[in-house]
Amino acid sequence: MAGIQQQQLVNDTLPASWNGSSNRIASVNVEEGQPQPWVDDLDLEDPNHQKPGWRKFLSYVGPGFLVSLAYLDPGNLETDLQAGANHRYELLWVILIGLIFALIIQSLAANLGVSTGKTFKHHTSWILGKHLSELCKAEYPKYVKYCLWLLAEIAVIAADIPEGIISSLLYYFKLILDTYLLIGTAFALNILFHIPVWVGVLCTGCSTLLLLGLQKYGVRKLELLIAVLVFVMAACFFGEMSYVKPSATDVLKGMFIPKLSGQGATGDAIALLGALIMPHNLFLHSALVLSRKMPNSVRGINDACRYFLIESGFALFIAFLINLAVISVSGTVCSAQNLSSENADRCGDLTLNSASFLLQNVLGKSSSKIYAIALLASGQSSTITGTYAGQYIMQGFLELKMRKWIRNLVTRCIAIAPSLVVSIIGGSSGAGRLIIIASVLQMILSFELPFALIPLLKFSSSTTKMGPHKNSIYIIVISWILGLGIIGVNIYYLSTGFVGWLIDNNLPKVGNVFIGIIVFPLMAIYILAVIYLTFRKDSVVTFLGPNKNDPQQQANMENGLGPEMERVPYREDLADIPLPE
């Protein structure tokens, strides 16, 4: 009976363009209760009605800064350092294009969370918003859903093979990042206070849990802390750039003249792109916006999407400037005419820890301390957002019912384990080798990107998911061109890189044939999986419009003429991470 009533609710709310019927599946999280009062029952000239402005905009500020930290984590900074050391400023254009692309994609993720799971007037129930991982779980059949999960596990295992560490226990996109986030902070503590790296790893895990405890007193306080850490990083790296004084002309050329010269430039460019556009960030952003209470009207949703776009744009602009500063510092120092042979060797194998000594030798001890403070801010803030992303992904795909503070504690302990073991056994050099391996994972993340990006592009362009808030034709064209472009680059580099390795390695022919028999079918499956996700039709409805029998409501929704409504119930499970009393 409940299923019949739910289907009747769907039939009564289908847009007129569906001709009164649909064979699609409706996925709704219905919360019964008294509907909230509607503003259209009140005086529209009510002076207490909140109009668009700075105060309203500031109520939406926060998610963009949390998301921007994925572009400023220690692994990203190390990739920047290596790109600058190897290619000077030539790859700055990759950072610029990547962050423009990231802004477009992140805005789609925010819009998806804001716009899905909505309901309009004359419904006696409420439908809460859904984020990307929940939509994927509702949309795809079980075998596809578990294949997506297994792809992430393969990436984790790939990190496990070279060093034999236990990072294969870490779950999904976010947790494969924790290794270098923890090590980055531990390096910073080692530089600042000369404590062993393994002690720094333990301090990092404890401090992350304490910082997450701030959210017990309100999500805004934690978001404010994250924003402060971002600006601390910006101040530190711009301070570094003031030491080296890079050529403004060369920097501008690197930003606006695409160039891939020198050995390994293509691989470094893909690593940079993989470091900038991370799959877990798409899941994170679509969930973070649901922590805000927002109107449930076309006009209110449009305002929210616009505010989130502006906020994300500002946060990503700061992230771009920080990445630019890191590459400029590394490129200038390592290409200096008077560079000693010892420092030249460091430039050839630059890591987060060796970079501090390089800066100290070339620019002085104060420069090394500034770098360490920036690295500390990067590591701490990134571990926080990584924990968020892991919780949202696990909640969406697996519907884990574990209490959040317990899940938070367990995931932090698991994340600390590989870093702690390696840092105890190998010290700073062992931890350095671990973070080099973690940097290789940036390319694996780039290969995994289609399996988060394609669902996002499809859902955000779908009337069944977004209603009148779906992407415009211009955004659809631009986003799909960008998405297919990076997917094509990934497939090309994967194919040519593997073929080149087969030709140049010293394995016997039988071994090469055996490897080819295994790998080429996997590459074909990868391409077929991308094609499947691209062309599969969506079947689950999450946007319920106004009653089809009310032409006025239809016109109000489609034209954005409906008045503002009272704030609707929001995702309290996403708005806080309660810790034990």
UniProtKB/Swiss-Prot annotation:
It is found in: Membrane. Residues 564-574 have a biased composition (Basic and acidic residues). One of its GO terms (cellular component) is plasma membrane. Keywords: Glycoprotein, Ion transport, Membrane, Transmembrane, Transmembrane helix, Transport. InterPro entries: NRAMP_fam (IPR001046). Residues 551-581 are annotated as: Disordered. The chain crosses the membrane at residues 57-77, 90-110, 146-166, 181-201, 224-244, 270-290, 307-327, 370-390, 409-429, 434-454, 473-493, 513-533. It is a multi-pass membrane protein. The lineage of its organism: Eukaryota, Viridiplantae, Streptophyta, Embryophyta, Tracheophyta. Belongs to the NRAMP (TC 2.A.55) family. GO terms for biological process: iron ion transmembrane transport; manganese ion transport. GO terms for molecular function: cadmium ion transmembrane transporter activity; manganese ion transmembrane transporter activity. Disulfide bonds: none annotated. It holds the Pfam family Nramp. Glycans are attached at N11, N19, N338. HAMAP family: NRAMP. The gene is NRAMP7.1. It comes from the Eukaryota. This is Metal transporter Nramp7.1. Its main location: membrane. Probable divalent metal transporter.
